[in-house]
Amino acid sequence: NRVVENNFMIEGAENAASARKDNPIPLYGGQKDSPIKHIVFISKENRTYDEVFGQVEKGEGDPSIARYGYNASFYNKNRTVGIENATIMSNHLKLASEFAIADNFYVDSDVSADGHRWLVNTYPNEWVETVTAASYGGNRSYNPASKAPGSLAMTGSAGAIYPEDYNEAGSMWEHLNRNGIDFFNFGFSVMFEPGFYDDSYKYTGIKHFANFPLPAALFERTSKQFPTYNMSIPDQFRVSQFIKEFNSRWGEGKDPLPQVVTVILPNDHGADERPGYGYPFRESYMVDND
């Protein structure tokens, strides 16, 4: 009954307008001028609200699963080294305590692969919805030793553009461009994966994953110096590159800041422990991202 009630609950527009009459943000496009002139959209990775913010009192979270929040204890895989009572993502929590925070997000995606599509306003088609679910369930995977002619590995993350289900009208990039909204992109939709070095390719050499062309509007407004998804690259380096290019492009007043700036900081995805490179725990990636 609750699901049916929620799905078919209709509230008059006048109620929403009345409740938000003192809100400076327009209720809908064209209602009034918005005080927001610039948006910096930062995309992150596979963390849930509760994992980081479950202990935040002003949010509706579950503190019992806030493994990257306050007073966390963790160990390496071999349980030979550990840390007790640490606050892992302290900057995230500080921002949440001092500024606005939103909870109860109900996303359209099931996993990361289709989530990156929704992120840039591309609707996954039937092929994607079935193949990604089968892949994540362990029942369908890419075979790097396949003998199929022209076999390529079409993988993706970082809000990439996928030819198999790209909207006829494009994604948010074309939408911004059509409506005269200036934007600039750091890291979205650009990803070159490493190659396969299996000895079965002794007659051909390395077999590479394939990338695909970016839409013109996005290519022209994308940084060529900002690193995309790769857990071997620290987010600290990404931020340094962002600051450097931000200052050179707009910080010195040469050009006006675009209305929309998109940035990807993906290392909260996590990866295997790399103690020799400063990542002795999986939590180390979260701290780097923080």
Label each PLM-derived region with a short phrase:
Residues 2-290:
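N-terminal pro-sequences and low-complexity stem/linker regions of secreted or lumenal proteins
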